[in-house]
Amino acid sequence: FLTLLGIVAGVATVIAMVVGSLAAFALASGSARVLSGALLLPLGVSAVTLGFGALIAFDSAPLNLRGSPWLVPIVQSLVAIPFVVRTMVPVLRAIRVSLREAAAVLGASPWQVVRTIDVPLVARSAVVAAGFAFAISLGEFGATVFVARGDHPTVPIAIYRFLGSPGASNQGQAMAMAAILVVLTATVVLITDRFRVPEVSS
């Protein structure tokens, strides 16, 4: 149960970090402003709408993932990506251009500039973004309920099913799972907060 919970949330976090980090670098450089509005869409629509849309989008070739174990973390990552981007973009934009220019003058390639200047300075915000993504994935319900497999429900869905079933034992299991979820989420948030960037200045 806990292993499956961690794997699903972990995969969703990795997807959200890869896509979100690339989008954040593009937005910070000003080369992909059109992405900004698109990345806000998951925040502007309900999770139910997002999950239903994903169910339709991934239900036919060539992206037929219905019933695939990958569909749940993909949908959860869609919910988390905007938070990753919004966490990393301000830090990337605050990096002084003169630092990048100095590295380029010294002969650094664009990739070396990113690796030696941007990555170290944005590392703390990346950890915070990953923590947010993981916490969001742990508790996501609205979108996940549309795509989760019946034999592999996520914890929030399992809690919902137990609460909808009569019997004191089902209620007790729901409460126990909810308590575990709260503890895990609180732990992730507290650990993440230690890496929070206190202030971004130019």
Label every PLM stretch briefly.
Residues 41, 78, 85-88, 96, ...:
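Transmembrane alpha-helices
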